[in-house]
A protein has these predicted regions:
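Helix-start (N-cap) detector for alpha-helical repeat units in TPR-like alpha-solenoids
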Residues: 262, 296-297, 330
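C-terminal "post-core" interaction segments
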Residues: 1-263, 267, 325
């Protein structure tokens, strides 16, 4: 069978003589409009919102990026606009040196660069030079990120070069340039949305756009944009009951599904323990076991904090709990080794 590629635009079927789309063609959602253009904007008067779809970091053949965004921001300044939605969910990258007029335009817009006024829709095709763009918007603007995680590491290798394998002579392309927009402790497999909104196949088929709907219906009272920072602030104020209540609420809320609370709490516990703040560390580790009782790692970490606090009996109990949850894995092995050390210390 001869190989072929189906006709497509940005991963979606392009209907033609031999291919048809499952999507209802009567109407077209904003993110699929004018796909012959790299970017376009539209005013949505009901919500006083300017919507921009930008799907490559390249100049469109009819209008360069600086000219396009100059027009967008002039429209915002001169009209009754309350929100800007920048949709880059289809944007696979390009030339990240072309990001500057987008970022500076947002920074300079007093009307838009405010919490709850500027939204960036991201998704599984947001990649490469567009990862640089969303990183910069995260660093320097009040963007609220909506949708699904990007498909690129926050810091990443890019800009490939052709090399030839020495034995097979096969050509391959390897990325060589390290792009680091954020410090290493903020690196992650992706940029996660602050407001998680998933899109189903049925949504696509029926022309629904839950991500855009979430932007248009956003209320800043409904969302904590920095969940970990929020919990840390409560913790530092000594409001431990509120820390626990808020942590339970947010870990059960699908809007925060891409926040790795377990890992963040675990790291916070170790930071406190390494600073000799043992009671605070114990509180954080105990909270993590309440939130994630089936995680062997949370019990292993709590056991270590108990051991270092002189609470050996509790350490033994919690290490055994970790082994029970992970009898054949690395965490279980770590707990068994810790128990051997505890036993040898008691014997000595």
């Amino acid at each position: 069978v001869d190989a072929f590629r189906f006709p497509r635009q940005y991963g979606f079927v392009k209907p033609g003589d031999e291919w048809m789309s499952v999507r209802n063609q009567v109407t077209t959602p904003n993110y699929l409009k004018h796909l012959d253009k790299i970017y376009y904007y539209e005013y949505l008067p009901e919500s006083k919102t300017v919507y921009v779809r930008h799907s490559q970091i390249q100049d469109d053949k009819d209008e360069a990026i600086p000219a396009f965004y100059k027009k967008v921001f002039e429209f915002i300044d001169k009209n009754d606009v309350e929100k800007l939605v920048l949709d880059v969910r289809l944007n696979g990258g390009g030339n990240n040196y072309k990001n500057k007029p987008i970022v500076t335009g947002i920074i300079e817009s007093k009307k838009i660069n405010k919490p709850g006024k500027f939204f960036v829709i991201i998704g599984r095709r947001t990649f490469s030079a567009c990862q640089n763009l969303v990183n910069e918007l995260s660093n320097y603007t009040n963007a609220v990120f909506v949708g699904e995680p990007t498909s690129e590491n926050i810091n990443f290798y890019g800009d490939n070069r052709r090399i030839e394998l020495p034995k097979t002579r096969l050509p391959v392309f390897l990325s060589f340039a390290w792009w680091q927009d954020k410090p290493q402790w903020e690196n992650a497999p992706w940029l996660a949305p602050q407001l998680a909104v998933e899109m189903s196949f049925d949504d696509y088929k029926t022309n629904k756009d839950p991500a855009l709907d979430a932007c248009l219906n956003f209320s800043d009272q409904d969302l904590v944009l920095d969940p970990i920072g929020h919990l840390k602030e409560l913790f530092m104020a000594g409001k431990l009951d509120q820390v626990e209540a808020e942590a339970k609420r947010m870990t059960g809320d699908p809007k925060y599904q891409y926040v790795n609370f377990e890992q963040k709490f675990n790291q916070a516990g170790y930071d406190l323990m390494n600073s000799k703040q043992m009671e605070s560390a114990l509180f954080v580790f105990q909270l993590n076991t309440k939130l994630y009782p089936k995680s062997a790692n949370t019990w292993d970490s709590l056991a270590e904090a108990c051991w270092k606090s002189g609470k050996t009996d509790k350490a033994v109990e919690y290490y055994n709990k970790a082994i029970e949850l992970d009898p054949h894995g690395a965490t279980g092995d770590n707990s068994r080794n810790a128990l051997k050390q505890i036993k040898s210390q008691k014997t000595f």
